[in-house]
Every structure is written in structure tokens, then in C-alpha cells.
């Protein structure tokens, strides 16, 4: 009777389902408990068998911490009520509050935050919102960090933009306030900018979006928060695209500096009709490295091989050949002469072959750059004596070729004077050619070598006796900006007092009327038979103290201080 009673309890609409199956469930191989096929582990708590491991949860991009290179905590937070591509900035900090008690004054530190969304900012100033807004809460719980992008000076120099744009990008990139470009999401980036009323933190958001539809051509859009309700489209007119903002060029330069990013954003890099000109790199024949005859064949082969690789990856052939050429030159042509290795293999009593002792132009130019570094010392004033070098005519021809890079013709000197030397040797009539360089990027391009890049700023620390010593801090080079700022953020360096010297070239202050030149003087045939000339380099440098321009103060200890000796005592012998 019991089976019949159970059958009568089944509803009529379930009577024709047929025999039950095990679809969607499975037995646990350990305890035999039935579990769903999508389960990760056995639901029997005493068993605990794990069937498969779930996918690792990706970090949320609701809030991303920006690398600032300082104690300033800035976050890029998504505005949920506007869409995935709308983001704002949130600043977190610690504020001190004093409380007066009977025992005295107590100073407490409270964590505070400031949201830069206009509505939240207005509500906070009016005192309408008592608690923290949703954007500050997201920033407090943030665990993701932005990815800094590399910016190579070689790509910046090769980019066909105005000199003012290049110099502004270079100044922003070399400031110790974090990397110039940081990647927040797949399409959104954060770019440094000059602090203003609209962008008081000195950062803004940009986005590169590509929309693909089957009916029309792919549409590429660039948005920048420095412009109001405007976007740059790939099919826009030339008048609109001619007004590219400086942040667009900064992002394009960062994309071109990395091979993976260049391939990802190749549509923006290769598109020429939208107003973005191709990044033309100077040919090797016009570059100063071509003066080294031993490098020509190796560099040309490596350049051809690099072009084949780039074309196979469907990238713009004019985008990154300079990187390949320069890297191959570093590996092959621009090595030190083989003299050093051959000398190590020589026996102690073996004579040195004088024909193998040579000095290349690259090695000599590296010594000039090192001499400039030594001269930019914080302990001395910013107007040093001219640096004098006696070099062959061929070396100066190579240097003049570097001075003329970027122009179709050889750059003529700013002034040519003839003078008669009577009070010093050698006597006679000589000609002096003078070049005035007023662009810091061009000075760096002239003096940069793979072994000794020109340092525009130098850091120092002050000793107890008032002297100054060079401070070897983590590198802030633009070439390795991603690695540098990542290391600084993880292991901050203690800097009690920031003392720096900087090379004065161009307009270095807002009220400066005439640009400060970097002067190169050349007097040929000082030694006419040997074809040796005299090269003079004149420059000025300034002093920075905690980020502000400081006047030079001579704090060196006087050299004529009398030595304090212990009084002599009489020693008697028995």
C-alpha cells in the first residue's frame, strides 16, 4: 500500500516525466555525496574534497592608485552614475587636530579625503554631506595601482611636433612627481599636466577608444579632460585635428616607446590623415654615430633586420627603427675598442702595440659629458669657467653634425669673429665660430651617448661641515621610468633635504626675457700641422632647494684656518 500511496501524491502534471536521471549532479569520489556539476568542492563539510579551483578574482578597477613619487595619495575612481569611461580624482591624506584638555594639548591625526567631482566638492564645501562620499570610500579600499609607461627621449626627439611641445613634455617627464603617463584601464590613462584651477592636482584623464562596426570603418576617438565636450575622431577635419593637445602627444610618445603598446595602439600611431604625422627617425647616415667607421656596416645590417621584424608584426616601419638601431649600436658598434680585452690577454713582458691604442668620438664625447657633470656641483656658483678641449678637426666635424640634426642643411654659427692673439701662445690671427643653443632637448641630443647620458639635474646631500656630496638616488631617467617609479613607491628613499643643481638652458623662470644659451665655441688650427683646434663650452646652472630655486651661498670652509696642534711636551730619558 505504501508505494501506491506515494504514487498518488505526485501531481498529475509530473506523472509523465519518466525515469529520474543524474543529469547536472555527480557523486563525490571520496564520500559519495551528490553535488552539482558546477560545484567547486563537496558540500559535505566533513569531506571537503576540492573538485576544481576557481578563477582568480581580478583586482577591481573601480579605484586605482596613481604613482606620484611623493607622500601625496591620489586615486583615479570611476563615477558609477555616469558610465565606465568617466573617472574622477580623489586625494587622501592625514590631518592633525588639537584637543585642549585639563592635562594639556593633545594632537590627534585623522584620515581625511577630498573628492574632486564637482557635485561632491560643492556639497562638501557647503557642509551638506556629513559622511564620506562613495568615491572616497572606493579610494580607501583601493588595492590596484596604475602602470607607469616608459617615455624614451629618442622617440620624443624624432616626433614631428613643435619644439615648444617637445620641451614642455620633456619638462613634465623629468619632474620628480611620478611618471608622465600611467595606464589605469585598457583605454584610460592618467597624464601629468600643469596645475591649474580645473586640474589642481596636476593630473588629468585621457582615453583612446576604438569602435568597430560591420557597416562602417573602425572609428578611433581620443578624449582629454582638458577639452570640454570635444573628442578627436579619426575622420575629423584637418582644422579640428590640428589642435592636438600636448597630452595626446605625450600618450603617443609613450605608446611608441614600448613595442607591445605600439602594436596595441598601432591604429592611432599609423593614422596619418588625422593630423598625426608619422614619427620619422633620423637616418643613420645623418646621425652622429655614423662618424664611427667601424660601426657603419654592423649598424646597417641590424637596421635592415629590424625593419623586417617590424613589417612582419604589421607595425609602422617608421615607428621604432631608432630603438633597434641604437640597441644594436650599443651591442656592436659602440663598444669600447678591442684594446682593453687584448691587453688582458697579453703577457706581462709583451710590448703594447701603439697602433691599437685609439680613442673613438663616442668615448671622447662621454668624457665631455662627464666633465659637465663634475662642473654642476652644488658647492660652487652657477657660472663656471669655460671648459676647454683640444681635439682634432674630425671630432669637431662629428660634433657639428650633431648640432645640425633636425635641419635639412648644416647649421651655421650664430657669430664668426676674427681675432689676433698677442699676449698668449700660440700667437697669430685666428677665427672663432660660436653656436648658441637655447633648447635643452637639443643640448641633450648633442651630448648624449649610450655610455654617458647627459644629466640635466644632479642631486646632492649636505655634510655636517657644510660641504656637499653627490647623492646617488634611484634613477629618474625617462628611458626607464616604469621600473624607477615602481621601485620608489615600494621602497621609499629617505630624503631629509632635497638639494639639486639644474642646467640652465632657455627660459628657466617666468619673468626671464632673454633665454640662457648653451655656448659652443670652436677655434680651428690652433696646432695647424696636427689639425688640432680649441673647443670651448660655456654654460650656467642653477640651484634647487626643496623644489624651489635657491640663491648660491658660499658655505665652504675657509682653507686658511690655522691647524690646532697639541702643545709639545718634554720627554726625559733616564
UniProtKB/Swiss-Prot annotation:
GO terms for cellular component: nucleoplasm; nucleus. It comes from the Eukaryota. Signal peptide: none annotated. InterPro entries: C2orf42, Zf-tcix. This is Uncharacterized protein C2orf42. It comes from Homo sapiens (Human). The lineage of its organism: Eukaryota, Metazoa, Chordata, Craniata, Vertebrata.
